[in-house]
């Protein structure tokens, strides 16, 4: 387990690097259980299976659903591009994912650009209190750019283990 002095609320930006089985996911659960602010914490990870596993653990620990919003990085990027189509510059056929191998990278790139430009910072700040990214070692360059841009908007902590990287 993580030592009690690891406090994800303590720093505006940070990272937790630890090997498998050391409690990174439990640290996220514990942090969300302690969260009392009105706005939820945004939690991003890479796979739908990761989202489902985290949701199950949060439910098992009776963490209030209002304390968090969980999504994959791809799902979050898609939601932002869909919600702000003019600012993202993404066409409807790309949002329809007619060619996912082409469209997902285009969406990630566009979302990284418009978050970085600051076009939606106020909307993001009004929606979320902070960001936690699980399995950060699996981020590609475009996903990393999104996370870095978000870290300029609200407090951010990334958690991962480079020895577990799958990409």
Which residues does each predicted region cover?
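P-loop NTPase Walker
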Residues: 1-83
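Conserved catalytic network of the ASCE P-loop NTPase/AAA+ motor domain
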Residues: 8, 36, 123-124, 149-152
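Conserved helicase motor core of SF1/SF2 NTP-dependent helicases
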Residues: 17-24, 48, 137-167
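Loop/turn-to-beta-strand initiation segments
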Residues: 40, 129-130, 153-157
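Inter-Walker segment of RecA-like/P-loop motor cores
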Residues: 62-113
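Short acidic/histidine-centered micro-motifs embedded in hydrophobic/aromatic stretches
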Residues: 76, 127, 150
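Conserved helicase/translocase P-loop NTPase motor core
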Residues: 96-129, 140-146
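Charged catalytic and DNA/RNA-contacting regions of genome-maintenance
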Residues: 134
């Amino acid at each position: 387990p993580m030592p009690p002095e690891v406090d994800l609320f303590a720093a505006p930006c940070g990272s937790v690097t630890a090997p498998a089985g050391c409690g990174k996911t439990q640290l996220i659960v514990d942090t969300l259980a302690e969260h009392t602010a009105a706005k939820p914490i945004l939690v991003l990870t890479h796979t739908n299976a990761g989202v489902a596993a985290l949701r199950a653990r949060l439910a098992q620990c009776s963490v209030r659903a209002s304390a968090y919003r969980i999504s994959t990085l791809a799902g979050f990027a898609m939601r932002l591009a869909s919600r702000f189509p003019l600012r993202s510059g993404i066409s409807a056929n790309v949002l329809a994912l007619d060619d996912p191998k082409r469209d997902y990278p285009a969406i990630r790139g566009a979302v990284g650009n418009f978050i970085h430009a600051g076009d939606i910072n106020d909307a993001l700040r009004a929606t979320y209190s902070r960001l936690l990214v699980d399995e950060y070692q699996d981020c590609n360059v475009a996903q990393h750019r999104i996370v870095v841009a978000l870290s300029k908007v609200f407090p951010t902590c990334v958690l991962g283990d480079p020895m577990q990287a799958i990409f």
